[in-house]
Structures are given as structure tokens and as C-alpha cells.
């Protein structure tokens, strides 16, 4: 009887070791890649409850968060009174509870969410004060007048336009058509956001 029991014990130990190893691999080795995946909606849900930093053009927000009275706490909004969100959509991208993030929302996501190591001291300060961590503002080199001119120039055509400062190489404008409104993708209504994403995919296809 001892040999079969010993065999079972060894098999059980090996299975436990494999299970522990795979769990450890996910927790410690792949954790960063999983957390930084723009399609990781669990991370998106966590960050939606934060005051995400704005994306600025010449000091004016073209993407910003407003407090709302729902489970997500903050609603991401795009454009302003004088800046058409469609003209900047190819730059800002979207930040969605359904489809993750794209554009600058993705590229500068760690700064906007407040997760960047560069914001370490801000995070420490928030920890001791008990305040909710806030994201940093990200300012683009875009000139709103040049951007509007590029957007207007494209009109109803399908295409893209980029303007650079010849001295510095800074991007002054980057527009593409057909345009789309990222506000629909940022909706907290999952049905509305999903429909907007399907429409965007259809337009790209």
C-alpha cells in the first residue's frame, strides 16, 4: 500500500508545483504586460475612477475628465467650444470602458492616469494625504490654427495631412478624414460605446 500512496503523493506534489509555478508566472513575470495592455478592461475600469489628466493644445483641453454621478466617477470628454473633437480624434484617440484606449490616450496613458514612475512623488503625496491620485496633463505641439486649416482642407475627401515646423521638427498639425467623434466611444453606456466602435471599424475597413 505504501508504494501507491507514495506515487499519489509525488503526483500531487508535481501538480501543485506546476499550478504554483504558472500562477507565479502570471503574477510576477507577465503582470506588467497584462496591466499595460490597452485592452485590459479591468485596468480601464480602475482608472476610470481617477481624475485622468487632460490632453492640451495651446493650453486648451481637447480631452479631459469631468466628475459624474455613476460608478465610474469620471466621464472622459473630447473637444471644446472652439475645437471640433473630430478634427483631433486621430491624435487623442479614445478612452473607452468597452474597447480600451488608442492614440495619445494609449501612448501617454501612464502619465494621464498618474501611473508613470515620473509621478512617483505625487503618488507618495497622495498616499499620505489620502487624496485620490490624479493624472498629469500632456501638452501637444499642435498649433490649433494649423490643425483647423488641415482639417478644413481635407474636407469630404478620405486622406491625411501633416505639418511640421521646419526648424524644430515639431508636429504642428496631424489630421485625417473621415473624422469621428471619440465622445461616443467614451460613453459609459456599453451598448452605445460598442455601437460607436463597430461604426469606427466599419469606416476604417
Where are these regions (language model features)?
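Surface-exposed patches in mature extracellular/periplasmic domains of secreted proteins
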Residues: 160-166
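Extracytoplasmic/periplasmic proteins that interact with beta-lactams or build/remodel peptidoglycan
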Residues: 1-160, 174-205
